[in-house]
Amino acid sequence: MDTKLLDILACPICKGPLKLSADKTELISKGAGLAYPVRDGIPVMLESEARTLTTDERLDK
């Protein structure tokens, strides 16, 4: 995924910043507590497609 795109994307729920996961398969929103999938390099920014972060993931910096 293009890092320039990541700079302009925001979480559609909380409008906060997103962070690309270490394995580059998800965009993480700590504010909303959600992880949006990245499929074939394209972020799927739908709440219905996102998974809820675990407590450990929410606390991890």
From Swiss-Prot:
GO terms for cellular component: cytosol. Pfam families: Trm112p. InterPro entries: Trm112-like. Belongs to the UPF0434 family. This is UPF0434 protein PSPTO_3844.
